[in-house]
Amino acid sequence: MAVHPEDKCAELPEPGSVRDKIGMFTAHSDDKRSLQPPSGRERGSVAASTSRSPQPAAGPGTTQRPPVPKKKPSLLADMGARPGFNQPRSQESCDSGTTDVLARKPVRSMTAGNGMPEGPQQTNKEMTIRSASIPARKPVPAPPSFGPPNTAQVPITRVRPSPPPPRKGGATPVSKITSLGEVKTGEISRSSQASANSKNGPAVGAEPRPKLPPRPEALSTSQSPLKSHRILLNEHDIRKGSMSPSSASTYSPLQQNGSSSSLLDQSSGLDEEALSNAIVASSLASAKALSTKKVPPPPPPQRQPRSRSILPLHSTKYDSPNDSSPTPSLRTTLRTPTKADEDQHDHHRHRKHIIPKHPHKHHEGDRKRWQSEVTEKERKRYEGVWAANKGYLIPISNPGNASSKQEDPRSAYPPSASEMVLNIVVRDIWSRSRLPAPILSQIWDLVDRQKIGLLTREEFVVGMWLIDQQLKGHKLPTKVPNSVWDSVRGVSGIKLPKFPV
C-alpha cells in the first residue's frame, strides 16, 4: 500500500499519544462552540459536512487519498470544516508539523492535559468516539444584543406588518419585538425571528412590568359639589384613552393577564367615583330647576248637596234644581201639565202602605172603573191635537163653476171640511200610539159616523180618548155610550137639552 508523502509528517508525533491530543483539541473546541453561537454560514457548512462523506482538498502535485475508515466520521468532518485543514500543504509545513499543532492549542489546555491522569484521558477518548455516532445538538442562541445589526452577515428582508391586537385581550398572543434596531432597519430574517419568538419568551417576560398610573386621591365631601359632573366624566375618558393599542401590544400576554385584575379594580373605582359625583351634581341641578314657583292646581268642584234621608220613597222629583227636562225632538201639541193635576193623579200613591192592615178587605173605592164620560182635562188635551191638524191636505172647492162640482171628487166634501181632519192624517197620528193596526181600525169604525173619510172635532176627540183607555188596559166597547158623546159636545159647563128630530 503506497504511503502518501503528507502522511510522513503525521507519523512523527511528539511524545505522547496522538489520539489523546486530538481528543483534547476537540473537547476544547466544543467548549468554545458552546460559548459562541455559530453563524448561518457555519451552520450550513457543518450540516453539509456531516451529511456527505469528507473529501480531501485537491492540491497541486497530490494524489487521491484512500477512503477514510468509518470509525471516525465526525472527527474528520470537524477537521475538514475548519479553515486551514482543506487547504494544500507544502513540504515546509510537514517539516514543522509539530510546532503547528502546538501553536494551535492553548497553553492552559496543554498544561492541563500533561498533568491529567490516565483515567480521565480514557473517558475523553470514549466521549469522542460516542460523539462521532451521535449528531451534535443545536447550540443555544445567545440573548439578543441591542447594538446595531451586522448588515454583512444577515440578509435584508422585510417584516410583515402584524395585525392590530384585540381591544379586550384576545387569546392570540401579540407578536414580540426583540430589539429596537431591528424594527428601524427591518433587517430580520424569518428564521431568526421565529427562533427568537419561540425561545426568547421568558427573557421578555423577565423584564420589569410598566408602572401603572397613580390612583387619583379620593375627593373630599366639601370639594365634590363644587366640580361639575361633566369635567369629571371628561377626565375619566382622557385617562381611559391614554392606553393606546400600540403601547398595549408591546406587553406580553403574561403581563396583560397579570395586570388585568388591577386595571379592572381601578376602572371600577373610577366609575363609582364618577357616578357618585354625577349624582350629586344632578341632584343640585334638579333642586335649582324645581325652585321656580308652581301654579297651584285648580280647586276641586264642590259637591252637590244630597238628601240625607234613608228611605228613598220620601224623595220627590224637585229635589235637584239643576235637573232640566230634555228638549223634545217633535213638536208638542198638548198643554204642559200643572202641579195640581199631578197631585190629583198621584193622590192614591201616597196612601199605599208597605204592610196592609186588612189583607182580605176589598178596596172598592180604589178600583179603577169604566169611565162613562171624558173629563175636562182630557178633552182640552185632545182638542189641542185636533186644532193643530184640522184642514190639512183637504182641497178647497171652487163655488163659481157648477159643472165642475159634479166631475170633481172634492164636491163630495161638506162645506165645513176645513174644520175636519183627513183620514190619512188621522192614521199618522194614531199610529204613534204603537197599537196594532186591527185595534186602530176598530176605533175608526166606532167613531166615523159620516162615512166620508173625514172626522169632526167630537169624533176625533172620542177616538183619542178610546186609544188612551186601550193603553190603560180597558177593553173597547161595542158601542160608544151617549154619555161620552155628550161630554165632548158643546161648551164645558153648559148642557144642552136633546130635541127630538
From Swiss-Prot:
Residues 402-491 form the EH domain. Residues 1-270, 286-375, 396-415 are annotated as: Disordered. CDD domains: EH. GO terms for biological process: lipid metabolic process. SMART domains: EH (SM00027). PROSITE patterns: EH (PS50031). Residues 1-44, 363-375 have a biased composition (Basic and acidic residues). Residues 87-99, 188-200 have a biased composition (Polar residues). Residues 242-269, 324-337 have a biased composition (Low complexity). Residues 347-362 have a biased composition (Basic residues). Keywords: Lipid metabolism. Residues 138-147 have a biased composition (Pro residues). It comes from the Eukaryota. Belongs to the IRS4 family. Positive regulator of phosphatidylinositol 4,5-bisphosphate turnover and negatively regulates signaling through the cell integrity pathway. Involved in rDNA silencing. This is Increased rDNA silencing protein 4. It comes from Aspergillus clavatus (strain ATCC 1007 / CBS 513.65 / DSM 816 / NCTC 3887 / NRRL 1 / QM 1276 / 107).
